[in-house]
Every structure is written in structure tokens, then in C-alpha cells.
């Protein structure tokens, strides 16, 4: 399972559904990140493994 962590220009990503979703594959997470990056306030998105501690997978930027 994977999740997305967004770096925002101002505000938080709590109102964006893609930031709350859990993704079964990296490809699905990349697709969710692409949708998240369409939001003007999102600067970059980090894909992490949904485990404790979270493990970094990759960065996606504009």
C-alpha cells in the first residue's frame, strides 16, 4: 500500500481526496499524484509506503 504526501504553496491538502487515498500499487499512486499536481497550490508530491515508519518511494514535481 502507498500514500501521497503533498507539499503545498499555502494551506493544507486535507481537502483534496487524493491526499487521503491509499493506493494498492505504485502505478495507481502515480496516477493519483498526477491528479493532485493539477491543483495549483500543490508544488510536489512524495509517494511513500503506508507503513510505520513510512518509507520513501519517489518524488513527483510539476
Give the location of each predicted region.
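Short, mixed-charge low-complexity intrinsically disordered segments
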Residues: 37-62
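Generic "edge-of-domain/loop-turn" microfeature
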Residues: 11, 28, 52-54
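Surface-exposed flexible segments
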Residues: 15-24, 56-62
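A short, charged, amphipathic alpha-helix used as a generic interaction element across diverse proteins
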Residues: 13-15, 22-46
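A generic structural signal for solvent-exposed, polar alpha-helical segments
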Residues: 8, 26-29, 62
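Intrinsic-disorder/low-complexity peptide segments enriched for small residues
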Residues: 2-6, 34, 58
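Short aromatic-glycine-(Arg/Gly/Cys) micro-motifs in beta-strand/loop hairpins
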Residues: 1-19, 50
Amino acid at each position: 500500500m502507498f500514500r501521497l504526501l503533498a507539499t503545498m504553496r499555502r494551506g493544507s491538502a486535507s481537502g483534496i481526496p487524493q491526499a487521503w487515498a491509499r493506493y494498492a500499487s505504485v502505478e495507481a499512486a502515480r496516477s493519483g499524484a498526477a491528479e493532485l499536481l493539477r491543483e495549483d497550490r500543490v508544488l510536489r508530491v512524495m509517494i511513500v509506503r503506508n507503513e510505520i515508519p513510512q518509507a520513501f518511494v519517489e518524488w513527483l514535481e510539476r
